Every structure is written in structure tokens, then in C-alpha cells.
Amino acid sequence: MPAAVASMAEAAAAANRYPDMGATDLIHAIAKHLKLRPEQVAVGCGSSALCQQLVQITCTTGDEVVFPWRSFEAYPIFARVAGATPRPVPLTADHRVDLPALAAAITPATRLVFVCNPNNPTGTTIIKQEFEEFMAVVPPTTLVALDEAYFEFVRTQDTPMGTEVVVKHENVVALRTFSKAYGLAGVRVGYAFGNPAIIAALNKVAIPFGVSAVAQAGAIASLAGAAQLLERTNETVSERDRVARAIGAIPSEANFVWLPTKTTETAATLAQQLADQGVIVRAFPEGVRITVTDHAEANRFLAAWNSITQ
């Protein structure tokens, strides 16, 4: 966003000064945006850093972290860094997070459960009722992290919203980021919100000065651009749905579409064929994730797709 770029440039001019370690202005801006209290919000060097901090405050050697798979690739890495044991749980046959299976995977050693919604890389969402049924059986001593990195691209109404569930459940913390819809991936800033006790614990293990002055300025300015954000995400959503229909991908609520493949080799071959056409997609063992941005780039992808499939 132009206002964010200008604010970051101004902040960069004072790069000889340390940033506000408490990110006070940013936290208050996020709290106002979410209609929460400042003590319910923590910021970090991207939401991925906050994921790592969640593992730090909940786990030690021998503890378990449960998460859907395939999902955000860093979840098992975060667990291992803390000495915890990753417990991946397969998705359903229709590429959705399997909440009953996640609940069944919880043991007395489980300290943290990640739920990525929309899920990365499949773009699928969970529904409100199944999340409440899931929470009804999750022990109150187990923390549930609702990872909403792609929240701004969601258009379905029947999916849990972090701002609602963290009020209803003290053992839920939600995560969002400025990297995706706001376009600030390069400056690294994300946020967590929920129970003030959880937020206080996150702050205790945060790296000092982890969110730069440039990142803080860009994030604050971005929050003021609600109309521009909606316009940007609406275009992405429209193009996402167009691409999904054109290639037969499954419906998505993120800024990408997921095309399942029968084999790892098929996914790798498809990614290479598209790369040869100047289009980069992400191959996984189970399929290909195709990021969608604007109309021009979607057209470029579809032209490359048609050249290798027709």
C-alpha cells in the first residue's frame, strides 16, 4: 500500500534509533482493529516467530505438538527446536483439516495443537460447529493455536473467527500476519491475540527489538487502509476462483489454489513444466500450490497451464 511504503521510508530515515521494544503504538492499533484490549495482543517477527514462541511457552522435551498434515511446513520444525515431538495428523480425503482426528491424537503429553485455517497449502477451511465440537473435547490444559495467516482472503461465513473464539475459549490463541494480504512479507511482522495470560507468556520469550521500526510503521499504516485492502483482496479472490475453475483445483479460501496429484513425480514434473514457461509454483509430495495475485498474473499462469496441458 502506498501509505505503508511512505511510512516505512520515513521510519528508515531514523534507522540509527532503536525501535520501540514494546511496539506500543502497533499493539494499540491492532487491538483497536480487532476490538480487543492491548493486553490481549502480542506482536512478533512474522506470525511464524509467534508460532515458535507458542511452542517455547508450552513445551519441553517429551511433550507433544499436534497439527494437521499436510499443513504449514514449519510446525514440525518448531516442535523439534523445543525438543518436543511432532504429531502430524492426516487431512481428510477432501483435503480438509480433520478435527475429530486431531482431537483423537491428543494425549496427556500434548501441550499444543495447531489448526491452520484456511489450511496451507490446501486452502480449505473448517466450519464453526465442528470447531466447537473439537474444543468441547480438548483438555483445558492444552493450548489451541488458530493460525489465520490467510484470514483476509476468506469469504465463507461458516468458519471460526479468531476474534470470537479467543473470547469464548481461554485456551485458544489466534495468529495473523501482515505478510500475505497486506504485502509486508519482507519486513516481517505478525500478531497473536487471546487470553492475556498467554500473551504475557509470549512476550516473556520474545526476542528484544524483534519487530523493527520500519515493520511497525508499515503495519500501522496498513491497518488504516481497510478500503484498499478489501479492494486488493477482492481482486485476488475473484482471480483465485477463476483459476480454480479453469484447472479443476479444489475450492480455496486463501490466496492460492491446490491441485492434488497422484504422485510426487507428477507434482514435480508439473512444477518444472510451468517453470520452463516462466511461472513458479510450489510442488509438494501430494500436489501443487499455485499462488494467485492479480488478473495479469493469473492470465500468465493460465496461458502457461494451457500450453502444457493441451
PLM features per residue range, with description:
Residues 1-48, 53:
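N-terminal small-domain helix-loop-helix segment of the aminotransferase-like
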Residues 4, 22, 171-250:
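PLP-dependent aminotransferase class I/II
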Residues 16, 24, 57-115:
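PLP-dependent aminotransferase-like
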Residues 47-48, 72, 117-121, 150-151, ...:
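Short glycine-rich anion-binding loops that position phosphate/pyrophosphate groups of nucleotides
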Residues 80, 97-108, 121-144, 148-184:
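Active-site pre-lysine segment of PLP-dependent enzymes
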Residues 86-90, 112-118, 144-148, 250-252, ...:
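Short beta-strands and strand-loop turn motifs
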Residues 237, 241-277, 286-288, 292-296:
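Conserved PLP-binding catalytic core of the aspartate aminotransferase-like
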